[in-house]
A protein has these predicted regions:
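Short alpha-helix
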Residues: 159-174, 178-180
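Short conserved loop adjoining the S-adenosyl-L-methionine
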Residues: 96-103
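A short, conserved alpha-helix within the catalytic core of class I
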Residues: 116-129
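Class I SAM-dependent methyltransferase SAM/SAH-binding core
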Residues: 48-96
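Conserved Class I S-adenosyl-L-methionine
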Residues: 178-236
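Conserved class I S-adenosyl-L-methionine
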Residues: 1-35, 39-47
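Conserved beta-strand signature within the Rossmann-like core of class I S-adenosyl-L-methionine
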Residues: 131-142
Length: 236
């Protein structure tokens, strides 16, 4: 099973109240006069639709692309509740999709904290999709007072893409872009079993095989996790 399919059941879902990252991003996009109304949009690595469903309420149409079927099923369920009919669902990787849709054009190409773009070819294809490209990614190492000690014990680290990513490609190719960096701190409460499952998922993503028993020392009971992130918004 796709690891992101496993993550779907515990992944954040759409909420009409914007989260901190969304609030700060939309505020900055508004300053740049970016308008989503009546636009044709693609949301790459859309997940459960946390952004998709908000954008769809203004867009003419939106393509929701994700390689995790379970994520898209949640998105569809929430879209039905909101009676949104302008969403096209694509269950595949970005590379698979672009190979079948090489001439596709949108008003806005959007990606938020997703590993969907893997290499320079993907970056170039992302750029070619639309006149306006919006990219949200990690600006630095994401800190977690729960996961970091576990990562250290297993001799690994947070693997979110932030050292070499789309920004590196834009700089190498002298592509001008607007950059805005902001912080986000959130506190997540998890039951013991959920915390262990979350830690195992992150270790698995890093190629580390561990068991529930291996994590018993770190998770004595329910936990309260503080996550500190530095996010960057690129618009070009």
């Amino acid at each position: 099973m796709n690891l992101w399919d496993k993550k779907a059941k515990s992944y954040a879902r759409y909420n009409q109240k914007l989260n901190s990252i969304q609030e700060q991003s939309f505020k900055e996009l508004e300053k740049l006069n970016i308008n989503f109304k009546d636009k044709k949009i693609i949301d790459i690595g859309c997940g459960t639709g946390v952004w998709t469903l908000y954008l769809a309420q203004n867009a003419k149409e939106i393509t929701a692309l994700d390689n995790a079927k379970a994520m898209l099923e949640i998105l569809k369920e929430d879209a039905n509740k909101l009676q949104l009919t302008n969403i096209k669902y694509e269950n595949c990787t970005f590379t698979e999709w672009i190979n079948k849709n090489q001439n596709a054009q949108f008003d806005i190409a959007f990606l938020s904290i997703s590993p969907a773009l893997q290499d320079k070819k993907d970056y170039l294809n992302f750029m070619r999709l639309a006149k306006i490209r919006i990219y949200l990614g990690w600006a630095d190492y994401r800190k977690s007072d729960f996961l970091d000690p576990i990562f250290k014990h297993f001799n690994t680290e947070f693997k979110g893409i932030y050292k070499q990513d789309l920004e590196s490609y834009l700089l190498e190719n002298n592509v001008k872009f607007h950059k805005f960096i902001f912080d986000e701190t959130r506190i997540v409460k998890r039951k013991k079993d959920e915390a262990i499952e979350n830690a195992l998922w992150h270790l698995n993503m890093n190629g580390v095989k561990a068991s529930k028993q291996d994590l018993e020392t770190f998770v004595k009971g329910d936990i309260k996790e503080t996550i500190q992130s530095k996010i960057k918004l690129l618009v070009f």
